[in-house]
Amino acid sequence: PPPDRHTLDLDSLAFPDGARTMTNKRCDLPPGSFRAQHKGYEEVHVPALAPPAMDDGEALKKIDDLPEWARPAFKGMATLNRVQSRVCDAALFGTSNLLLCAPTGAGKTNVAMLTILQQVGLHRRPDGSVDGSAFKCVYIAPMKALVAEQTANLAKRLAPYGLTVRELTGDSNLTRAELDAASVVVATPEKWDIVTRRAGGDRA
């Protein structure tokens, strides 16, 4: 049998104030905020949130406390930040999967560096050099511009280990030999999906 039909009164569901609900001029600002009127515009100053207090026993990880071989990747830094310090041991010494959710600017790139160094530590030779052919790390960035930026950043920081970092996007193809020789590949999700689905071939 056909389904029952009902009449829906859309007018009864509309906001009583119409579009004016989207232009509410009232805004409760946090303590310490102020407004200043200028010619042609209004300035609203909202102070930055203070970071929450450190937990008991919580401390920032000093770069000098990292293994000596890991320190060159953090040249110019004195400590890791709070997010990085909390996951440092899991990223640098752990072997389990790691899922990190942190806001923009929280330092996720340095956490990624710690995970790369985990592989560096596993493949150090007795003389201190690194066997870069024994592992491959894939760094996924959402946009081509970020891929180029992170490739340059990682290449500079991993240079002391003799590791090759290559960029892989729709604008930069790699030969199979170049891809095999890279210890770290920085790619967009779309390009890496294409590469991993492709069977064989001389170019990636």
Model-assigned labels for residue ranges:
Residues 75-204:
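Conserved P-loop/Walker A NTP-binding site and adjacent catalytic elements of P-loop NTPases
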Residues 1-89, 95-99, 128-129, 134:
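Helicase-associated low-complexity/disordered flanking segments
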